[in-house]
Amino acid sequence: MSTEGGTSECEWRTIKLGDIGKISMCKRIMKSETSPDGDIPFYKIGTFGGEPNAYISKETFEKYKSMYSFPKKGDILISAAGTIGRTVVYDGEPAYYQDSNIVWIDNDETKVINRYLYYVYQLSPWQISTGGTIARLYNDNIANAKINIPSIKEQERIVSILDRFDKLCNDISEGLPAEIEARRKQYEYYRDKLLSFEERKNA
């Protein structure tokens, strides 16, 4: 049996994000270790996905990078506070990230490729915990979030389609607002169709 787009339902299975890798974060940086300018940008939750307003020394960066968890190029960074679930693809350039507020899954790409994860995250698969007035994404929220995955080959096919739509949306960013909105809605429709399936039992 196949679904729209030619995806065979029997190829899909449901897993928890915690099954594909450890949830990781950088070493805590103390305020005294930062400065308004310097060698290595330090992204806090307020500057994540934007321009940094704090920096750390190259020595501190190299020390912590070698001793503690640090993302690999292509890993998908997730904001656990502020704008919950905002994602940034780590580009491999020297940078450091605020502990606990910015996390990633040290993903096993033999199970799920990072770019597929990036698009899945846009669907916000996690349940957000609230304490008082502050919403937060805890490690357990991420680890227990369920996603549906096909074979690696099918993941690559889906990513290829969504990447093309993504590029198309960006290419018309200078166009008419109505045209841009229509294209974005089309992109979101196909993204949801390709990624959203009823929960399946693990094979």
Specify the residue positions occupied by each region the protein language model found.
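Sequence-specific dsDNA recognition surfaces
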Residues: 18-31, 46-73
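A short beta-sheet element
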Residues: 44, 61, 65-122
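Coiled-coil heptad-register positions
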Residues: 169, 173-176, 180, 184, ...
